[in-house]
Curated annotation (Swiss-Prot):
Gene: aroK
Subunit structure: Monomer.
InterPro entries in UniProt: P-loop_NTPase, Shikimate/glucono_kinase, Shikimate_kinase/TSH1
Domain of life: Bacteria
Name listed for the protein in its UniProt record: Shikimate kinase
UniProt catalytic activity: shikimate + ATP = 3-phosphoshikimate + ADP + H(+)
GO cellular component assignments: cytosol
The organism of origin for this protein: Bacillus mycoides (strain KBAB4)
Gene3D superfamilies, per the entry: P-loop containing nucleotide triphosphate hydrolases
Pathway: Metabolic intermediate biosynthesis; chorismate biosynthesis; chorismate from D-erythrose 4-phosphate and phosphoenolpyruvate: step 5/7
Binding site for Mg(2+): 15
């Protein structure tokens, strides 16, 4: 089976769904953000603070290309889709899943989360503007799942059905 790339805005449920899907499909799951932190030996928020977002995006592009293209679930950072080369790579080498969640719901979830470098100012308008600027890229995915106010079980049932279509 081709790799499954799980995309979506921060807080949409990519990591959670990736872990559950890996158990259901008996496939390994790899989180690009976690792999970048391991390779760079620092937290993403520190990469952003010390090297900037552009450096992080470069690490992200390198990471996605270094991962297997068969039999693995890859959970991505929310901004990986900003680069056309990443979108092209994922489409050519796997099935791309877009987990959508209403940005107002995500903002409420993330209000107290200090690990999100792009949500530190807690500026809801800027957060939603960033989401909207990426939305068309997310929507290039093969499979779209709306996770807003759904349980993990509901999301999984819908996702498994769409993967098997």
């Amino acid at each position: 089976m081709k790799s499954i790339y799980i995309t979506g805005y921060m807080g949409a449920g990519k990591t959670t769904i990736g872990k559950v899907l890996s158990k259901e499909l008996h496939m390994d799951v790899v989180d690009t953000d976690q792999k970048i932190e391991e390779k760079q030996e620092k937290a993403i928020r520190d990469i952003f603070a010390e090297e900037g977002e552009m450096a992080f995006r470069e690490y992200e592009s390198e990471m996605v290309r270094s991962l297997p293209v068969q039999n693995v679930i890859i959970t991505t950072g929310g901004g990986i889709i900003e680069r056309a080369e990443n979108r092209k790579w994922m489409k050519e080498n796997g099935t791309v899943v877009y987990l959508y969640c209403d940005p107002h719901v995500i903002a409420e979830r993330l209000r107290e989360d200090t690990t999100r470098p792009l949500f530190q100012k807690k500026d809801i308008d800027a957060f939603i503007t960033k989401f909207e600027s990426r939305r068309a890229y997310y929507e290039e995915a093969d499979i779209h799942i709306d996770t807003t106010n759904k349980s993990v079980k509901q999301i999984m049932n819908e996702l498994k059905q769409k993967i098997n279509e």
